[in-house]
Amino acid sequence: MKKFLKYLAVFLVVLLIAAIAFLFRPIASKKIQTSANEPVVDVVLVGGGIMSATLGTYLTELEPNWQIRMYERLDRVAQESSNGFNNAGTGHSGFMEMNYTEEKDGKMDISKAVKVAEQFEISKQFWAYQVKHNVLGQPSSFINPVPHHAFVWGDNVAFLEKRYAAMIKNPLFYGMQFTENANQIKQWAPLTMEGRDPAQKVAATRMEIGSDVNYGAITTQLVNNLDKHQNFKLSTSSEVTGISQNDDKTWTVAFKNLKTGKADHVKTRFVFIGAGGASVKLLQMTGLPESKQYAGFPVGGVFLMTDNPKIAAEHTAKLYGRAELGAPPMSVPHIDTRYIDGKKYVLFGPFATYSNKFLKQGSQFDLLASTNKNNVLPMTAVGMENLDLVKYLVSQVMMTDEDRFNELKKYYPNAKREDWRLNQGGQRVQVIKKEEGKPAKLQFGTEVFVSKDRSVTALMGASPGASTSPYIMLNLLEKAFPQQVKGEWNPKLHEIVRSYKQDLSDNPVLLDQVRQYTSQTLGLHYTPLTQADFAKIAASQSK
């Protein structure tokens, strides 16, 4: 026994030493050797998703002479979270997402819903501009009109009614309908009501202007257009292996062709890391002091999906429920119409899964590889402070197929098992951020990183993500290129986004003009406001 304890003690000491050595290992890239006469490009975009595609499109229009390079580790762009089958395709506008509104001291706070709705109006303007200029193709190839509904039952009916009463006063949500009438809800979303107990108390809201968006199609079309420009070059099957700063403050990005094994590098003045869940690891390569405050927590997701034509024909709606008390925002259940590559699907979920991967096609060592002496304690602290999230993830991972199907039946009572299959969605990596003097926080939104010298930027985090990518990248431009945005770029930005720097929630006339323009261009459902409508809005705002 003594011998065993001795060996155990030695083993634990060795394990502790190995753990300390691992945590204190260098995480920044070694300096990449370059020659002084190498050409320097203007921009390197790491990752071939919707963020890089959107930023590349902005920059090509603002600075057509800039040399831009894009590197994607897979053999095609838009194959991770941007891919149509890897997300729910929601054009997040705050219309139905009840986790964007919360009741505080008896008052309904709709500020987050207003913010998200404003941002999506920017997205629609950006896409409409690209359609007008033949950058994006037929609108129905990437966006389709699908009304947005919030749906509740039982005790949550009172919450939804209060939410509606608060939201209808804001011009962004004018036209929202509310009902507790089961027959009316059946007209809006037949599958949701067929087979439901008629005694059950239910309520729903509806916004006609809602949409379903294929972000993979947008990404592919934007990149295809970029590829037509002589100053742009896309390299697929190319994994970034290092990012280091040069003495002249430019950057060298090293990459390896995964098909040939050939290693190469490029020098650049500006780096954008838009690699989805992998952005945290890639940002750590830079060695920037301000990058040390970040860590990532990966969460996967699966959906139940059907392409049964009869079911798809009966459901043209995105319908969101309300998350259970104490559950994280990612747990909101919804049953959605999806249009992907010309075919109609119905999706239900998401159900959380756990994986150490930071990308769907990543490595099980991703989480471990991103852990170091700078973030191990913040990660531990966040885990201890978010036991509700841990409990939720455990309960989700333990779910059986029968459990998932029973959740579906709450939203589609007549559902049949044989019509549905599981579809693995993309990986989302929630950001853990530790600022000096403050406790570490788990963030559920998106995080824009800009280095102090503004030469390195990154996009991390999750929802609303892709749906507000034009707004997010516009925000990034403002932080990374403040002089140009205020100066020579300003007229072009106003041309691309007509409401740029204007508050639509306080300007119903401009909002109506913008929605008429984007809805006509993108083929969305919108009824222009009348003088009587403007009078109602003014009266509701004065109350």
UniProtKB/Swiss-Prot annotation:
Q: Which NCBIfam families match?
A: mal_quin_oxido, PRK05257.1-1, PRK05257.1-4, PRK05257.2-1, PRK05257.3-2, PRK13339.1
| Keywords (A to Z) from UniProt | FAD, Flavoprotein, Oxidoreductase, Tricarboxylic acid cycle
Q: Name one GO molecular function term.
A: 2-hydroxyglutarate dehydrogenase activity
Cofactor(s) needed? FAD
Q: What is the lineage of its organism?
A: Bacteria, Pseudomonadati, Pseudomonadota, Gammaproteobacteria, Moraxellales
Organism encoding this protein:
Acinetobacter baylyi (strain ATCC 33305 / BD413 / ADP1)
Reaction catalysis annotation: (S)-malate + a quinone = a quinol + oxaloacetate
Q: Do you know which InterPro entries this protein is assigned to?
A: FAD/NAD-bd_sf (IPR036188), MQO (IPR006231)
Pathway-wise, it operates in:
Carbohydrate metabolism; tricarboxylic acid cycle; oxaloacetate from (S)-malate (quinone route): step 1/1
Protein name as catalogued: Probable malate:quinone oxidoreductase
Enzyme Commission numbers on file: 1.1.5.4
Q: Which family does it belong to?
A: Belongs to the MQO family.
An individual GO BP term:
tricarboxylic acid cycle
Q: Which domain of life is it from?
A: Bacteria
